[in-house]
């Protein structure tokens, strides 16, 4: 499984809102943003590209509990959205994937989320996914 395996929900495609061929963002959002914790992690890592953070630091920076974000970090690492590596002390640190396509789509997601109508569509999708479990 990777960051681009799930298709858009068919409702409110981002492509239709932007008119600029953002179907890859549709796929990425639908396949990866299953919670607002996932959203927060993605935005944090994209805004701090190249910076790695361990679980405790990330939780502190996001104002979330470690148990809230740990499963999201594991899922993102498994999908290739982020890279995880253990340091010499054994502490795992996370950074946005070095894959240029993942970085491009993450950057585009953050840009698009600044537009109210698009952000509301993203919120609707996350809520729908959360309600499905």
Each predicted region: which residue ranges?
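Short acidic, hydrophobic short linear motifs in intrinsically disordered regions
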Residues: 41, 51-61
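N-terminal acidic, proline/glycine-rich, low-complexity intrinsically disordered segments
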Residues: 1-9
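Short, well-structured alpha-helical interface segments that form or flank functional binding sites
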Residues: 33-40, 53, 67-71
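Short, cationic-aromatic polyanion-contact patches
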Residues: 32-36, 84-110
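Short helix-capping/hinge SLiMs at alpha-helix to coil transitions
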Residues: 31-35, 46-51, 78
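Short alpha-helical segments that sit at the start of domains
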Residues: 11-40
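Amphipathic alpha-helical dimerization/coiled-coil segments
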Residues: 104-133
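Short amphipathic alpha-helical interaction segments
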Residues: 63-79
């Amino acid at each position: 499984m990777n960051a681009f395996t799930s298709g858009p929900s068919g409702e409110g495609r981002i492509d239709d809102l932007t008119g600029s061929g953002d179907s890859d963002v549709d796929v990425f959002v639908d396949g990866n943003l299953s919670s607002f914790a996932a959203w927060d992690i993605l935005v944090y890592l994209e805004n701090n590209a190249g910076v790695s953070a361990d679980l405790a630091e990330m939780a502190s920076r996001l104002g979330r509990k470690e148990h809230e974000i740990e499963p999201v970090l594991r899922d993102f690492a498994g999908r290739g959205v982020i890279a995880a590596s253990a340091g010499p002390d054994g502490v795992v640190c996370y950074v946005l994937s070095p894959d240029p396509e993942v970085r491009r789509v993450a950057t585009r997601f953050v840009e698009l989320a600044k537009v109210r109508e698009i952000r509301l569509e993203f919120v609707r999708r996350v809520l729908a996914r959360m309600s499905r479990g």
